[in-house]
Amino acid sequence: MSEAKITPSRHSYVKDRLQDSLNRFIKHESFGGVLLAFCVGAAMLVANSSYADMYFTFFHSEFGAFFSDSHFKVSLQDFINDVLMSFFFLLVGLEMKREMLYGELAGFKKVSFSFLAAFGGIICPVMIYSYFNSGTAYESGFGVAMSTDTAFALGLIMLLGDRVPKILKIFLVTLAVADDLGAISVIAIFYSDNINMQWIYASLILVAVLIYLNYRDTKYLSLYFLAGILLWFCVHHSGIHVTIAAVILAMAIPGRTRVNKKYFINMLKEFERMKVATNDWNDVVYARESEKVGFWRGSFKNIRSFIFGNQDVEKKIDMAKTSQLVHMLDTIGTYSRYAQNPLIRLEIALQPICAYFFVPLFAFANAGVTLEGNIDISLNSVMLGTILGLVVGKPVGVLLFCFLGEKLNLATRPKDLNYLHILSVGMISGIGFTMSMFVANLAYKDDIMSIDMSKISILVASSIAAVLGLLVVYLSTIKQDNQLENINEEDEIQKLKETQSII
C-alpha cells in the first residue's frame, strides 16, 4: 500500500478523533454547567437554612495522617480546592495543548486572535476593579474579576440548541482555554507567597524529568503521573500554587499519534492467525449463533451438559485454542494502546469525572454564603469592582482587542464569526463562578467577610452576564436566520427568472 493512500486516511482519523473529542468536551461541559448551577443553588439554600452549621462544620472538618512525631492534616475544603481541582487544571492544560497542536489555536494568526480576546478580557476587568479598589485592603482581589467558568458558559449557550452556530461554540471554548491560561499565570505569579527555593530546585528537577519523558515519547501515563505527584508535592511546599504543577504535567503529556509500521504489520499477522484458528471466522459465527438461544432453553442446555457431559459434544471447549485466541486479542490490544494518543486518551478519561464530580463538588463546597442583613452591598468597592469587571469589562475587552488585532493585522478572525458573535461570547465570558471563587479564596485568604462579599458579587455578576449573554446570542442567531431567509428568497427569485426565460 503506497504512502499516498495511507496519508489521507491517517489525517481523516486524527481529524475525526479531534472532532469527537471537541464534541465530547462540549457535551460534558454543557451538562456539567446545568449540574453546576444546581450545586450552587443547593449550597446557597443550605448555607442559609437551619443546616448551615452542619454544612460549614462538614467542609471545615480536618483529616490526615501521622508518623511518629510528624503529622499532616488538611480540611475537606482545602482538599477539594487543592487536590481535586488539580485534576481540573490538568484537564484545562490538556485542552490548551490539544487546541494549540491540532485545533483552533494551531498557527500564530489563529492562536493570536483567541489570545488577544482573552488578554482583553483580562486587562479591562482588572483595570475596572483596580479603579474601585486601588490602595485599599481589597486591591489583591483583582484576579476575581477576570476569570471565566467554561462549564457554565457552554451550558448556557446549549439552552439555544442548534440555533447557536458551531463557530461560536468553538470560539468560546478556545477563548475560555486561553483565559484559563491567563488566570493560572496570575495565580502562580500574584497569589504565591513565602517562596522556598529548595523546593523550587526540586520542582525544576522533576520538570526536567517530565521533559525527558516527553522527549523519549514515553507512552506510559503511569510514569508521568508518578513524576506529576512528586511535582505537585514540591510545588505545594515551594509556596507557588499547585495549579501550575497540573498545567506543567499536562504540557509534558505527548500529543502525538505514532503508528509504528512494525506494530501495524504485527497486528495484521495476529488477525491472520485468528482467521486461521477460527476456521475463517466460522467458529466465532457458530459460537455467537449458539448463544442466541433463550434464557430458559440455554439454562436447561447448560444443566444437561453438566450432568450428561459426554452427551453434549458441541459444548466441549478446546482450552488450548481458547487460550491462543485470548493471547492474540491481548497482543492486538497492546499494539492498539501503543498507537493511541496519550493526550487525547487522558483528556477523554478526565472530562466526565471533572464535569460531573470534581467541579460540581467544588461549587457546592465554596458557593455556600450566608446572606446577612448587616452586609452593605450597595456601596462596597469589592462588589462594584467585581460586578462591573465581569459584566462590563469582559465584553468590552474581548470586543476591543479582537477589533484592534484584526485591524492591525496581528490576528485572523475565524470564518463565519462576526462581531455580534464576539460580543455575545464576551458577555458569556463574564460568567465567573467556580474560577472566580477559586481566586477569591486565594486573594482574601482568612478575611471571611471579604470572601463572602466577593462570592455574592460573583453570583450577581455571573447571573447578569448570563442573561445579557443569552440575549445577545439569541439576537445574533436571529440576524443569521434572516440572512439565510434572504439568501433563500434570492435563490427562488433567480430560479423563477431562469424558468421564465426558458419559457
From Swiss-Prot:
Belongs to the NhaA Na(+)/H(+) (TC 2.A.33) antiporter family. Pfam families: Na_H_antiport_1 (PF06965). NCBIfam families: NhaA. One of its GO terms (biological process) is regulation of pH. It catalyses: Na(+)(in) + 2 H(+)(out) = Na(+)(out) + 2 H(+)(in). It is found in: Cell inner membrane. The chain crosses the membrane at residues 31-51, 74-94, 112-132, 141-161, 170-190, 195-215, 229-249, 348-368, 384-404, 420-440, 458-478. It is a multi-pass membrane protein. Its main location: membrane. The keyword Acetylation does not apply. It comes from the Bacteria. HAMAP family: NhaA. Keywords: Antiport, Cell inner membrane, Cell membrane, Ion transport, Membrane, Sodium, Sodium transport, Transmembrane, Transmembrane helix, Transport. The gene is nhaA1. It comes from Helicobacter hepaticus (strain ATCC 51449 / 3B1). InterPro entries: Na/H_antiporter_dom_sf, NhaA. One of its GO terms (molecular function) is sodium:proton antiporter activity. One of its GO terms (cellular component) is plasma membrane. This is Na(+)/H(+) antiporter NhaA 1. PANTHER family: NA(+)_H(+) ANTIPORTER NHAA, SODIUM ION/PROTON ANTIPORTER NHAA-RELATED. Na(+)/H(+) antiporter that extrudes sodium in exchange for external protons.
